[in-house]
Each structure stands twice: as C-alpha cells, then as structure tokens.
Amino acid sequence: MAHKKGVGSSRNGRDSESKRLGVKEGDGKFVSAGSILVRQRGTKIYPGDNVGRGGDDTLFAKVDGIVKFERKGRDKKQVSIVVPEVVAQ
C-alpha cells in the first residue's frame, strides 16, 4: 500500500459562503420604515420600540426615525426607533 496520496489531489479547499451578519444601521442614524437594522442568528439583540423581528431574527424598522441601541437589563441589548418630534413653526 502506498503511504503517500496520489499527486494532484487535495482534501482541503471547501468553505461555506459568508452570511453577511451584523449591524447594518448605526446608532443615531435616520432610517426609513422597512430598513434592516441587524442581521443575526438568534436574538443577540432584542427588538425595542418600533422595531420588528423577522422569521430569521432579522431586526427591521417599523417606522421612520432615529436608531437607538440601548441596554436591556444587565446583560441584554435592544434596538429601538425614536420618532423625531415634528417642530411646529
């Protein structure tokens, strides 16, 4: 039996495609309704006010407003959308 594998063959060279997860819109940024805020696996960040959660745990804006990341208790995070007050003139 050969103790070396045949020439020109490799058992490496496979990898899965990256999933492009993470925060998509930063804190303090103005976003429109339907904008994706966070792509994640599981609820690493929880939805707050005016934020929805998709079937794949993606967080998205339900209304136009400003993104606000905040702590939820001691060890959890959440993202909310703050609707700016309309200034009457």
Curated annotation (Swiss-Prot):
UniProt-listed GO biological process terms: translation
Keywords: Ribonucleoprotein, Ribosomal protein
Similarity section: Belongs to the bacterial ribosomal protein bL27 family.
Name of the featured protein: Large ribosomal subunit protein bL27
Region (Disordered): 1-26
Gene that specifies this protein: rpmA
GO CC field: cytosolic large ribosomal subunit
Record keyword rRNA-binding present: no
Annotated Gene3D superfamilies: 2.40.50.100
An example Gene Ontology molecular-function term: structural constituent of ribosome
